[in-house]
Design a protein with these regions (language model features):
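Generic surface-pattern signal
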Residues: 79-83, 191, 279-286, 329
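Short intrinsically disordered coil segments
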Residues: 177-181, 282, 327
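Conserved C-terminal alpha-helix-loop-beta "cap" of PLP-dependent enzymes
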Residues: 231, 235-326
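N-terminal entrance/gating region of PLP-dependent enzymes' catalytic architecture
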Residues: 1-5, 12
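Conserved PLP-enzyme active-site core in the AAT-like
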Residues: 9-235
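A structural alpha-helix within SAM-dependent methyltransferase catalytic domains
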Residues: 113, 325-328
Length: 330
């Protein structure tokens, strides 16, 4: 497949009107590179674990970070901004992750989508953690969905790629979704150059798409197993996983997420820092490429903090749990 065919294939998978591949290290960078968030726009974002990307990537815009993914928080941060769905703008953007932020929050995308349209805001969803297998943001009300493709490519792509998808504007009974129509017009006119993919990159992405569903289900199933192990482990605390009834967004997640509750689990250490914990583990837990078959750990609050974020691979969860257990007992 060439780039156009891959973009068309992604659009079909995402239920999108149009899709574009972008070279970018992460979704906020891709959103900035697309150029659809323009000077004079306001960007309201919940991404407390990615605040620096918004502080430096949208210099000409009015960026407001909110502390909660709730409708009330976004509406409050949008007051006083005169906006519409006219292409000329200025535009109001709402940004959330389908799973993200500290604690792996799951916003009510249906409620946010409805409120965004009432406020004349364009809802953008970073769908990287849940991915298109685990969440359908465009169906739930997003005007734009972006997803880093590390896991889609099984960590084999030589560059960091992001897929951007815009919602269809045709609703039931021949009604037009003004938000989606505005987003598509901005998307079509952004002037971003078509991505120049090598034959190797195209092959990796094509192969990744063909095996996507089975691999994603494996990631999700292993995350659930590891979350249940950690929740029962007395050597850690505050296990955050949307599939656990203790998670603050569990009820919302059951209606937003599909095929499980994503590949990520967070927990807090009790007796050591993240950096000390990493030193007790095999290097592959930290050095394996993102999105690959090996379970990977990070420290979202820094190595001096106590929070660990785990992304389940497709490796044996019993072996992973045993390795974690041995490190926790040292």
């Amino acid at each position: 497949m060439d780039v156009q065919q891959l973009e068309e294939a992604w659009a079909v998978r995402a239920g999108a009107r149009d899709a574009r591949l972008v070279e970018a290290p992460h979704v906020p960078a891709a959103l900035s590179l697309l150029g659809i968030v323009r000077p004079g726009d306001r960007l309201v974002a919940f991404a407390d674990d990615f605040a620096d990307a918004f502080a430096h990537g949208f210099d000409a815009c009015d960026v407001a970070m909110v502390g909660s993914p709730s409708v009330d928080a976004f509406v409050a941060a949008s007051k006083g901004f005169d906006t519409s769905f006219e292409v000329e703008g200025p535009h109001l953007w709402w940004f959330v992750n389908s799973i993200g932020g500290f604690g792996l929050r799951v916003p009510d995308l249906r409620a946010l989508g409805c409120a965004a349209r009432e406020t004349h805001a364009l809802l953008v969803v970073d769908n990287t953690v849940a991915d298109v297998f685990g969440c359908d943001p465009l169906r739930l009300g997003a005007a734009l969905s972006l997803e880093a493709l590390d896991r889609v490519c099984a960590s084999k792509a030589p560059r960091k790629l992001v897929a951007a998808s815009v919602a269809r504007s045709q609703l039931k009974r021949h009604r037009v979704d003004a938000a989606a129509e505005c987003a598509h017009a901005l998307f079509a006119d952004c002037g971003a150059l078509a991505l120049d993919l090598s034959a190797e990159e195209a092959y990796v992405l094509e192969c990744g798409l063909s095996s996507f569903n089975a691999r994603m289900q494996a990631h999700f199933d292993r995350a659930r197993a590891l979350a249940e192990y950690l929740a029962a482990n007395e050597m850690v605390r505050n296990v955050r996983y949307p599939g656990l009834s203790s998670h603050p967004d569990h009820a919302v997640a059951t209606g937003i997420l599909e095929h499980g509750f994503g590949p990520a689990v967070e927990f807090d250490l009790m007796d050591c820092t993240a950096g000390e914990f990493f030193s007790m583990l095999p290097d592959e837990f930290r050095t394996s490429p993102a999105g690959g078959p090996t379970t990977r750990l990070s420290a979202p609050r820094g190595k001096q903090g106590s929070t660990i974020r785990l992304f389940a691979g497709t490796d044996n969860p019993l072996v992973v749990a045993s390795t974690l257990d041995n490190a926790l007992r040292k």
